């Protein structure tokens, strides 16, 4: 897009983003114990007839490499009565609309909306959640039926994909809330990081809880699969 002469005060220069984003990714990986081994950063600027054209946003890709056994890579089929579990951090006004905001021009939304869409990292909580998942995978019998990360759309996306066509009911009063000013929509749709959604066999819940306590990872049983092919969130007052 056309680069104007005035840059919004909340924006960073491409150079700052290239340096700080790269440093931030490797810093998080080191804190978490997962080295950053590949990635790239890219920006572009071009002057033509006294007008400057360039990327409004810098592109950064980063990643690591891992492996898993075939047994632990294939998801199981949800059955009625499976427990829906969330492991990790609380809900905050973080990452709201992150998937949408990242796909439009900078400045399209208000600064408040764009700030709420920005992610905040917590490497320690990520490590705790990771330790629980790894411990369960390394057991002789893996009690995890299915697992999903909390990406775009938060609980709405994660938990609905966990229960799949089996259907499920989520008790919103069981979801951990770190900011009491959150609305119901913000609670179920925020993208606060360092959380995993798991589908656990009912008889294994207490065992999983002990593993989570050992790793100091907050664990919440927030609902269960229903078998009625419907997915719903229910508030404390019974409203769905």
Regions found by a protein language model. Name each.
Residues 2-9:
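Short, small-residue-biased leader/transition segments that mark boundaries at the very start
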Residues 21-52:
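Short, conserved loop-to-beta-strand elements that form functional interface hotspots
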Residues 56-58, 144, 148-240:
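Glycine-/charge-enriched secondary-structure boundary and capping motifs
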Residues 59-70:
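Short, structured beta-strand/loop micro-motifs enriched in basic residues and often containing a Trp
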Residues 69-90:
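Acidic/histidine-enriched ion/cofactor-binding microenvironments in catalytic or ligand-binding pockets
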Residues 89-101:
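Short, Lys/Arg- and Gly-enriched loop/turn segments at beta-strand edges
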Residues 113-152:
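Polyanion-binding loop/helix "lid" in catalytic or ligand-binding cores
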């Amino acid at each position: 897009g056309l680069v104007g002469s005035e840059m919004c005060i909340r924006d960073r220069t491409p150079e700052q983003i290239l340096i700080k984003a790269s440093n931030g990714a490797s810093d998080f990986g080191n804190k978490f114990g997962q080295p950053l081994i590949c990635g790239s950063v890219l920006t572009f600027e071009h002057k033509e007839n006294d007008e400057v054209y360039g990327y409004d946003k810098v592109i950064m890709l980063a990643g690591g490499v891992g492996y898993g056994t075939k047994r632990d890579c294939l998801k199981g089929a949800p059955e009625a009565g499976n427990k829906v579990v969330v492991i990790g951090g609380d809900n905050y006004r973080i990452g709201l609309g992150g998937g949408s905001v990242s796909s439009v021009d900078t400045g399209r939304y208000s600064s408040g909306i764009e700030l709420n869409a920005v992610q905040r990292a917590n490497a320690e909580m990520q490590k705790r959640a990771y330790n629980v998942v790894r411990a369960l995978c390394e057991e002789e019998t893996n009690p995890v039926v299915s697992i999903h990360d909390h990406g775009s759309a938060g609980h709405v996306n994660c938990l609905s994909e966990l229960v799949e066509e089996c259907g499920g009911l989520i008790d919103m009063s069981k979801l951990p809330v770190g900011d009491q000013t959150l609305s119901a929509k913000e609670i179920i749709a925020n993208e606060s990081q360092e959380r995993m959604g798991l589908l656990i066999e009912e008889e294994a819940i207490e065992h999983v809880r002990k593993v989570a306590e050992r790793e100091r990872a907050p664990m919440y049983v927030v609902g269960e699969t229903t078998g009625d092919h419907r997915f719903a969130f229910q508030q404390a007052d019974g409203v769905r």
